[in-house]
Amino acid sequence: MLGGAFLGIFSGMLSGYIPGLHPNTFFSEFDPTYLDREDVLTFASACSAVNVPLSKVESMFLGVPDDQASVAVLIPLQRYTIEGRAEEAARLVALGTLSTGFFAAVALPYIVKIVGPMYVASKPIIPWLVLTILALQTYDNGLRGLAVFSASSAVGYVVLSGPLDVASPLEAMLSGFYAIGPGLSCLMNRTSIPKQRPGKPAISGKELPKCGILAALAGCALGFLPGLGPANVVSVLTRLGVDTTERYLLVTSGIDAADAVSSIVALHALGNPRSGASVFIQRSVGDITYPEVLASVGVYLLVSVLGAWLLIFSTRVLGGVLSGARARVLTGTVVLGLLALMTFHGLGSLGTAIACAGIGIYALRSGVDPSLCTSALALPTALKLLGVG
């Protein structure tokens, strides 16, 4: 068990700290024969628990805009960074992750009972729900949002169902959208990250449980919607009262935690893996029992405390190091490294990453929510569920 935990923590740190490296890369390509059943469950839970908070480091420090006017319509985490308050944002993410994980764990016995009927009832309308959320998000981003949606969807459809030889489509697209694109934008703008200062978020005592419960419910529901992430449902969340940056960070970070917990439950209750971690578990050990669900969720909650601490600690360290020209040097190194990696994977992967980077840059410069780029995954998946294409 300890071996699986240490391996999971290490993998979660790698995928959290290295831009463009997704934990699904480990889950899809990692096939250790020396791990027993207990180690497999521990590895998957620990990797997810560390990656969920640490994945926010990339958003905080990579591709930060060069003026606060643009930050207001882009990634809320970057607003804190450009104001020198990255540690405060990290603490909000940590609070959202831990509080929602707690509420999801408390509700676990009830989730196990309702997840089956809920899935059966919602299965026929799942693709329509995905399309509705994408349409709502596109509407909120205007004509430029429509351009990003159309271009991303076209690239995703061609890459996922076309004749292109792309070694790792998910890695190539996500690297282009959320690492290479923002990195190049930062370098072109010669963006300077200001010195970060220590800080703690000022939130009321009633705010945390409200956001935690909302995130737990939204995370469980989001798990049924393939191709979408927490940021995609912001158009829905703002209509439910998530109308401040603090609430947004608490809820979206919490949704990630709830989604991780509910995906383990779904594997047990439905035999249907809904995440990279649960696919890895099913491939390695098959279906899991209810006691194993409890053990996996327990490991997730325990290790998520470490993940939250690592996020705050890393933000404090990086906030002192990545200021001025040093941030541009690191960003340039990351971009060159990812381009070299895509080249190693082949021309198909490199071309996909460059195309997605161009879309990502356009989204950033035109004030479009970057999460709309995930329509590259969500739309082809929804169409496939509808039997189209």
Give the location of each predicted region.
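Residue-level signature of transmembrane alpha-helical entry/exit and packing/kink sites
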Residues: 1-4, 40-43, 145, 149, ...
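Helix-loop-helix hairpins and the membrane-proximal interhelical loops
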Residues: 1-37, 160-229, 235-241, 337
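Extracellular loop-to-transmembrane helix junctions
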Residues: 3-4, 32-56
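Transmembrane alpha-helix interface/packing and boundary motifs in multi-pass membrane proteins
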Residues: 7-23, 52-63, 136-139, 215-226, ...
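Generic transmembrane alpha-helix motif of multi-pass integral membrane proteins
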Residues: 27-32, 78, 131-137, 234-238, ...
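Helix-loop-helix junctions within the multi-pass membrane cores of secondary transporters/permeases
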Residues: 44-130, 232-335
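Membrane-embedded alpha-helical modules
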Residues: 92-192, 288-389
